[in-house]
Amino acid sequence: MERVRGACQSPILILLAIVLPFPSTSGPAIHPLIESLAARIRQRRAQLPELSPFALDSVMESISGQLDGEELLISNELHRCRGMRKLHLEIARLGGGLQVLHCVFFPDPRFDLPIFGADIVAGPAGISAAIVDLSPVGLTMPEALLHGLESLPIPAFQQVRELPEWGSIFSPFVQFIRPASSQEESWFVDLADGYLKALISSVIDATPDASDAASTIQRHKSQLSYCIQQKRNDKTRGVLEKAFNPQWADRYIEEILFEDPPPL
């Protein structure tokens, strides 16, 4: 197994992901790994209880801009369900090169549930990064969910990447890799699917604590810390500022990518 060093181009952050068709056909097709994981996420998302759309300003649904002379296309799909306050799936494409899938499921702090996150970064040379995790916001991972994750077989990925400096927000189950083959890409989708199935089972069985319970307050604090840590990624902000403007970038990061949990 090779551990790959280098700048983290997008572990659970950099650009965004899209669930709508891109309006441009000038570039290459969406990478098969991005298509496969997006399809699997949508399939599992549909199994969540009381699923409904998340209110989204229409100007944030489908976005286009210019970055270094290339067209940047972004689209977003957001939902909510019982137990999860925000389910976000995006795909972005820059010209005929960079493609990014970004997905985060944020739990309602009243429920003892983790944050699901997955990112894929693809370029002309293939996949440079793929990451998936269930990050606990409680003091520990719920026991039933922990057992489910421990039972999942972890594929023997050849190139395991190092986490960024702010990687303390991730769990011991985080997988951050550079797939070395189409077989490893398939393994990654199946692994992410295993994480999603474990999460969905926990969501279905979960019951809420009171809003003023110590456990809820602690989870709210931890989720707020997660969002703050994610917002510290200057690369994400720099790309958005260059393609649009600083005010728009701030709004996108604060309202779409890593919106703080609402006050209890």
Curated annotation (Swiss-Prot):
It holds the Pfam family Fe_bilin_red. The keyword Oxidoreductase applies. It catalyses: (2R,3Z)-phycocyanobilin + 4 oxidized [2Fe-2S]-[ferredoxin] = biliverdin IXalpha + 4 reduced [2Fe-2S]-[ferredoxin] + 4 H(+). It comes from the Bacteria. The keyword Oxidoreductase applies. Catalyzes the four-electron reduction of biliverdin IX-alpha (2-electron reduction at both the A and D rings); the reaction proceeds via an isolatable 2-electron intermediate, 181,182-dihydrobiliverdin. Belongs to the HY2 family. This is Phycocyanobilin:ferredoxin oxidoreductase.
